[in-house]
């Protein structure tokens, strides 16, 4: 007969005692695998992702200086408490053995260097001579580094901290950086004078307006007004809609041909970034394009994370879609990693929004967003506000080079209303159809253009 088990038994930790009781009741031997058998089975599986996860977990744990007891307290609060505690039963001994091995070899890893330096400063084993501490890219700071800076400030009351950062570009939570350290700077470091750098020498005013409005939809982001040296605003963000995945290559190539013509007329080589949320967005024909356009265009593919701090004349952001491998990403992190990461932000997709902002602002002249007709990203409707008309241009592959009339769907909020041709003529329909059936008549000016 079958033995019934439930997920509740697993979560409560009673699963194995229940199995033992039921097997004994059926006069069957209860034979748990020995540790050696379990290790042999794990060796057969050869799971680099599990090894990498444990390594990342230990690194983040050390960065935040968390003890096993603190981790268990957090695990007790997780939805799958049994899984979290079982994971700690594995990872804590590994962590301890790792530290013992480092000590035996008289070695330290990077996180230990930071932690040891912090301890030496606090215990005054090292008395620093510094009057000013300069920290760049402060939005990426993690708790371990912040603790070292704070220890140095506390050791010498005359020491001053000068930090430069942009909370709009904080995109490394997965590596332990905590945006709250910057957004709540006075809370962590005391009385603070803040100076805003309000001029940008990279993107034009059109890109700047769109990107700044988008990022500040999250009220937790610091409010800033940014002025661009280049005042251009017309058609600086272009949304390129395509029908099928195989259309992307021809769509991109067509745009590159146009940009190559511009480069020839300007008698210079233009720098072009192709950016992807994921590395698999890299076009298979990139090498061919580099060869074809080598005299006009300097082409480069980068992930959005790697593009931070860089700039190009024109930028194409690929795969601005919903669904699998989407942007914003809908891949859910393993809840176990939350045991050692900063507290998640309340605003939906907060870090993905900052990553999108980074992509938008890599361009000096124009940013192109490629989106699939049937999988339009939830970020796209936010760029189609009336005040941005003329700056943001929506181009449908079906309508050629002409700007398509589009607007955010008022019903679902994540789709867009655009021209659809039905049996009784054209009308405005939602891109989320059939999940959203909102429709309306064409605006008079668009109706007049229909044949």
For each of these PLM feature ranges, what is it?
Residues 1-107:
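A basic/glycine-biased coupling hinge at the interface between accessory DNA-binding modules
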Residues 132, 264-271, 287-298, 302, ...:
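Conserved helicase C-terminal RecA-like lobe
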Residues 143-237:
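Conserved RecA-like helicase ATPase core segment
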Residues 409-412, 430:
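Short cysteine-rich clusters marking metal-coordination/redox-active sites
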Residues 420-428:
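Short linker/helix segments within small regulatory modules
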Residues 434-451:
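Short metal-binding segments enriched for Cys and/or His
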């Amino acid at each position: 007969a079958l033995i019934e088990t439930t997920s509740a038994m697993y979560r409560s930790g009673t699963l194995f005692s229940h199995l033992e009781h039921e097997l004994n009741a059926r006069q069957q031997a209860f034979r748990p695998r020995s540790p050696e058998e379990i290790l042999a089975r794990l060796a057969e599986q050869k799971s680099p992702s599990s090894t990498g996860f444990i390594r990342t977990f230990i690194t983040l744990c050390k960065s935040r200086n968390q003890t096993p007891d603190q981790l268990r307290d957090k695990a007790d609060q997780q939805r799958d408490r049994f899984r979290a505690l079982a994971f700690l039963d594995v990872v804590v001994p590994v962590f301890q053995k790792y530290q013992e091995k480092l000590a035996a070899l008289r070695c330290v890893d990077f996180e230990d260097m930071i932690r040891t330096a912090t301890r030496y400063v606090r215990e005054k084993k090292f008395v620093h001579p510094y009057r000013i501490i300069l920290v760049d890219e402060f939005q990426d700071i993690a708790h371990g580094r912040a603790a070292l800076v704070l220890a140095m400030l506390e050791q010498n009351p005359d020491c001053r901290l000068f930090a430069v950062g942009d909370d709009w570009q904080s995109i490394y939570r997965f590596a332990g950086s905590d945006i709250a350290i910057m957004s709540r700077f006075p809370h962590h470091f005391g009385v603070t004078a803040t100076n805003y750098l309000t001029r940008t020498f990279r993107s034009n005013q059109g890109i700047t307006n769109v990107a700044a409005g988008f990022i500040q939809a999250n009220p937790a982001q610091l409010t800033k007004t940014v002025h661009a040296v280049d005042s251009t605003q017309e058609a600086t963000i272009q949304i390129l809609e395509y029908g099928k995945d195989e259309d992307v290559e021809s769509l991109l190539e067509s745009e590159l041909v146009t940009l190559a013509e511009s480069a020839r007329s300007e008698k210079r080589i233009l720098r072009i970034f192709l950016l992807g949320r994921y590395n698999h967005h890299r076009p298979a024909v990139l090498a061919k394009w580099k060869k074809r356009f080598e005299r006009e265009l300097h082409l480069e593919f980068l992930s959005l994370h790697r593009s931070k701090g860089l700039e190009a004349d024109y930028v194409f952001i690929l795969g601005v879609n919903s669904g699998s491998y989407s942007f914003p990403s809908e891949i859910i992190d393993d809840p176990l990693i939350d045991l050692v990461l900063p507290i998640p932000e309340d605003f939906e997709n907060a870090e993905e929004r900052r990553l999108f902002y980074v992509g938008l602002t890599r361009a000096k002249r124009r940013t192109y967003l490629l989106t699939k007709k049937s999988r339009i990203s939830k970020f796209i409707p936010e760029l189609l506000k009336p005040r941005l008309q003329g700056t943001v241009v929506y181009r449908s592959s079906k309508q050629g080079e002409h700007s398509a009339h589009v607007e955010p769907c008022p019903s679902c909020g994540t789709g867009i209303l655009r021209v659809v041709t039905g049996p009784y003529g054209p009308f405005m329909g939602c891109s989320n159809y059939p999940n959203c059936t909102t429709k309306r008549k064409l605006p008079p000016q668009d109706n007049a253009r229909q044949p």
